[in-house]
A protein has these predicted regions:
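C-terminal motif of bacterial Sec signal peptides marking the signal peptidase cleavage site
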Residues: 22-24
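A short helix->beta-strand "capping" segment at the edge of beta-propeller domains
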Residues: 33-61
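Beta-strand-rich domains and repeat architectures in extracellular enzymes and scaffolds
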Residues: 52-85, 289-296, 301
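Structural signature of eukaryotic scaffold interfaces centered on beta-propeller domains
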Residues: 62-70, 114-119, 160-171, 215-222, ...
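Blade-loop segments of beta-propeller domains
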Residues: 94-123, 129, 149-155, 333-340
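Beta-propeller blade signature
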Residues: 184-193, 308-326, 367-380
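Conserved blade-ending motifs and adjacent loop-strand segments that build the rim/top face
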Residues: 252-265, 326-347
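Loop/turn-rich, solvent-exposed surfaces of beta-rich toroidal or solenoidal domains
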Residues: 274-321
Length: 381
């Protein structure tokens, strides 16, 4: 099943057309000064042959790397076309039987899942903008909890808006999630034992400012800390459960642009999202001891004749931060290789990209392999 598998130990795989720059930064209340060295980056490329039994996708908007019950490293990927979790076994480079979800009946999930966490080999928690579900690995709904209408959750993964996640704490049987409470942003806590919610913490810094489609910040969790990064600017903040804030406010060095204002016209809003950068969520990589972020640059296409081509002709940038949010790496990954619509996912020690972009991959073969470029990071500390 393995058609190609290679691994090169180097700071960057130049065959992918990349350039890397170690960048110092200025920080806010608790950040350090300048980074001393870039982390070690190890790339490997995996091609997984398509299955004759199950319909797979060239890339998936929502994925998670897990270890299955046999101890194999596996990608659990949400397939919106088949309403299932596809399973890509990276240990043996093959697709395994998917977890098929139901739309109706006692195990029915009526909405579209926008977040999930496979926290154990046999258990998944998932959210469809209405309910939180506890699922097993055959797609049965073991339990479910409906979130209250207020405060308003803003959990989503959208390449034009923002990415904001939930955070499941198995030891407490609780889920943290971001919500809007009147003119403030808060983290709510759902107690799975009682189904009750309460306010966990306030999140400072949100003003309701709008830049095109973008209003809310990207928001992720690093254990009990909250990491925020607005999609229209380079700044990053970490808020502890006690309210202490660490900020990184230095601009990028490889791409200086930030999003400007936009007229409230539908066509202008669409082009604003393509002609401006989009700063993605900042994710803690516990095994690497680093934070990482993907940034989409403005489209390279001149003119406004082809919005679809413009959306795929965008440079990808990788930013890496140390524990104190000092920038330790900025990397230009180039354009035309990955999908800007969520075609990547973070792992405990790095990031994976699906090889999927219509500008360079013109194949119409439904049996084409799924290609994953895997980057493993290691802190220089």
């Amino acid at each position: 099943m393995i058609t190609n598998h290679h691994c090169n130990r180097l700071l960057l795989n130049l065959s992918l057309g990349m350039a890397v720059a170690a960048a110092g930064c200025s920080t806010g209340s608790r950040g350090g000064s300048e980074a001393d060295s870039s982390p070690l980056a190890v790339w490997d490329t995996i091609e997984v042959a398509s299955s004759q039994e199950w319909f797979s996708l060239p890339s998936y908007m929502t994925s998670q790397q897990i270890v299955n019950s046999e101890g194999d490293t596996t990608v659990l990927a949400l397939n919106y076309r088949t309403n299932s979790f596809d399973r890509i076994n990276l240990t043996h480079n093959r697709f395994a039987a998917p977890i098929v979800l139901n739309r109706e009946g006692p195990d029915g999930i009526t909405g579209e899942i926008i977040w999930f966490d496979a926290f154990a080999p046999d258990s998944i928690v998932a959210y469809d903008e209405v309910k939180v579900y506890l699922l097993d690995t055959v797609g049965r709904v073991i339990d479910s909890w409906q979130l209250p209408g207020e405060p308003i959750p803003f959990v989503t993964r959208n390449a034009q808006l923002h990415t904001a996640e939930m955070h499941f704490i198995p030891s407490e049987r609780s889920i943290l999630y971001p919500a809007r409470k009147e003119e403030q942003m808060v983290i709510e806590r759902l107690d799975l034992s009682t189904g009750e919610t309460d306010e966990y913490m306030m999140v400072p810094g949100w003003t309701g400012e709008r830049r095109g489609f973008m209003v809310y910040p990207n928001l992720t969790f690093a254990e009990t800390d909250v990491i925020t990064a607005f999609p229209y600017q380079a700044a990053v903040s970490r808020i502890s459960a006690g309210g202490d804030v660490t900020s990184q406010t230095a601009p990028m060095k490889l791409m200086m642009a930030e999003c400007g204002e936009c007229a409230p016209d539908p066509n202008e809003l669409m082009w604003h999202s393509l002609e401006n950068p989009h700063f993605g969520e900042v994710v803690w990589l516990p095994e690497a001891g680093l934070y990482a972020q993907i940034v989409l640059g403005p489209t390279n296409l001149e003119g406004r004749e082809d919005p679809q081509k413009a959306s795929f002709d965008r440079n990808f940038y990788l930013r890496v931060f140390d524990r104190n949010l000092n920038t330790v790496m900025e990397t230009d990954l180039g354009a035309g290789r990955f999908s800007p619509y969520g075609g990547w996912f973070f792992t405990p020690d790095g990031i994976c990209f699906y090889g999927d972009n219509p500008l360079t991959d013109t194949s119409t073969d439904e049996n084409a392999p799924t290609i994953i470029y895997r980057l493993t990071l290691q802190s220089a500390d």
